């Protein structure tokens, strides 16, 4: 069996980071909105449950959450987590959904109550007011903090290596121990280029929404 070359190994690790990044975004963005709505609920048990969830997740390290998701099912319920990638996805989605919910909160609360009252005067339901009047304003307001959180996510994907997931930094480290330094620099280039693309993308989105004054 031929040994894997550094470039093949880094490419494999790169794919892990990218998959973890996009799956986390795909699931955490809508879940964060659900958590935000639950926190605004008039049903107090649901309201306090969601707020307690956010408090716990934001108050504990992502690294700890990765270990809990990987080992807790087996230790508590004799149902071991067989896939380390799945464990990483669950931990990342839970963590980032909590942070996204707080970003949504800031955006929603920044919209004046007069906007809601104007919608009510026009005979709109609360759902119609949110999607037709509030949503675009919220999106414009949350783009800067959301972009920061998304860029942080790209770097946080490297934490998956602590549960044995062979992401790009773990792959680079293996070859560094063999006396090669360039895989580390290649890894740095990956993060710089990827985050550079995201920065350009979010900048483009902000410019596209400049017409919408809030």
Model feature map: region roles:
Residues 1-214:
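Transmembrane alpha-helices and adjacent helix-loop boundaries
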């Amino acid at each position: 069996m031929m040994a894997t070359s550094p470039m093949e190994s880094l490419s494999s690790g790169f794919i892990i980071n990218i998959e973890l990044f996009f799956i986390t975004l795909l699931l955490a963005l809508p879940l964060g909105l659900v958590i935000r709505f639950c926190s605004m609920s008039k049903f107090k048990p649901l309201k306090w449950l969601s707020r307690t969830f956010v408090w716990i997740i934001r108050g504990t390290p992502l690294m700890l959450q990765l270990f809990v998701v990987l080992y807790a099912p087996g230790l508590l319920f004799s149902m071991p987590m067989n896939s380390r990638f799945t464990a990483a996805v669950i931990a990342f989605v839970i963590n980032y959904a909590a942070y996204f919910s707080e970003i949504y909160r800031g955006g929603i609360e920044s919209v004046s109550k007069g906007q809601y009252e104007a919608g009510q005067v026009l005979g709109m339901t609360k759902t119609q007011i949110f999607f037709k009047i509030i949503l675009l304003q919220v999106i414009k307001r949350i783009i800067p903090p959301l972009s920061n959180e998304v860029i942080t996510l790209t770097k946080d994907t490297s934490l998956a290596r602590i549960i044995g997931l062979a992401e790009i930094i773990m792959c680079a480290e293996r070859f560094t121990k063999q006396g090669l330094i360039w895989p580390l620099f290649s890894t740095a280039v990956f993060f710089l280029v990827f985050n550079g693309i995201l920065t350009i993308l979010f900048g483009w989105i902000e410019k596209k929404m400049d017409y919408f004054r809030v």
